[in-house]
């Protein structure tokens, strides 16, 4: 199965072998455990800056999605890409337009795709200009992509580099902010779980895996390349299919007691990050952001409850878009 990207060369998530391996390998250094660990101090600062702003208000209220969850991954991705924090509002607008617009919003969708392509095109062109003037290529994501090669020695095209950066932005923001928001929504609804994580912060990593399983944000679309049969179902070439990872995570043949949310679940072979060769390359980063975001929130805001209606996204990524809270 595969799916061509808009605007030229496909990014790694839609490449097929053998080029998929080359495209993925070029991105791996940015997402190793060691590379992600280097981002922890700044991620913790980002979380505390956001919490500082929340706690300076007089009304003891906050929207965990709007005030917190939506900002953390935007600023971490900006850090990873070496672009200003101030570009975050633009990033959020693009993500909402691309992942949550209906088919009737195609003009808005196409505009956001064009703006994103232009943004990263300028970023790549500027780096190429700097290198041509004698600067070092750099070891960040842009530098890694510009020095990457296919097995035959061919450099990645500029279009491929731009589309890979677009992928990192789309895949690394909405999914993570949805997961942070869902975790805080759960903890606002289940005070026993919240109290336990406050007193036993060592449980947070296990709780994160359970939140990822129970509230997995991603459903992936694919186009069938060849007639095939899967699970007794016939699929024809050219048909589109959806791979609902959230449904897999609630399959009793896959997970024991799938409808129970157990923050100390011992075995948790969830599929929130996908499976196989296209498994999410940024899972280490997402887990780190979730861990730090929950640690800092619970350390500084240990008691909170829902304070109004929660709204959820529609589209390919599912997550809470409004989580109004009363901070006790």
Located regions from the model:
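Cytochrome P450
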Residues: 1-328
């Amino acid at each position: 199965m595969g799916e061509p990207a808009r605007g030229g060369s496909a990014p790694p998530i839609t490449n097929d072998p053998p080029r998929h391996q080359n495209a993925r390998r070029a991105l791996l250094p940015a997402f190793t455990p060691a590379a992600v660990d280097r981002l922890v101090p700044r991620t913790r600062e980002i979380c505390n800056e956001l919490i500082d702003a929340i706690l300076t208000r007089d009304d003891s209220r906050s929207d965990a999605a709007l005030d917190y969850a939506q900002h953390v991954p935007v600023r971490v991705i900006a850090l990873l890409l070496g672009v200003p924090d101030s570009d975050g509002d633009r990033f959020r607008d693009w993500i909402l337009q691309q992942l949550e617009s209906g088919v009737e919003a195609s003009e808005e969708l196409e505009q956001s795709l064009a703006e994103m392509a232009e943004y990263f095109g300028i970023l790549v062109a500027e780096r190429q200009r700097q290198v041509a003037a004698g600067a070092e290529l750099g070891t960040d994501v842009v530098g890694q992509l510009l020095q990457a090669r296919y097995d035959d020695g061919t450099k990645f095209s500029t279009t491929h580099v731009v589309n890979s950066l677009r992928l990192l932005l789309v895949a690394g923001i909405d999914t993570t902010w949805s997961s942070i928001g869902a975790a805080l929504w759960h903890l606002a609804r289940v005070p026993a779980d919240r109290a336990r994580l406050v007193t036993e912060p060592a449980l947070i990593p296990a709780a994160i895996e359970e939140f990822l399983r129970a509230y997995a944000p991603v459903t992936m679309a694919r186009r069938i390349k060849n007639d095939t049969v899967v699970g007794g179902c016939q699929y024809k070439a050219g048909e589109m299919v959806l791979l609902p990872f959230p449904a897999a995570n609630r399959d009793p043949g896959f997970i024991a007691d799938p409808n129970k949310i157990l923050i100390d679940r011992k075995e948790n072979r969830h599929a929130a990050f996908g499976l196989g060769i296209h498994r999410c390359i940024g899972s280490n980063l997402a887990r780190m952001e979730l861990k730090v975001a929950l640690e800092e929130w619970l350390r500084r805001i240990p008691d909170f409850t829902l304070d109004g209606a929660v709204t959820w996204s529609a589209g390919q990524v599912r997550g809470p878009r409004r989580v109004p809270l009363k901070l006790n």
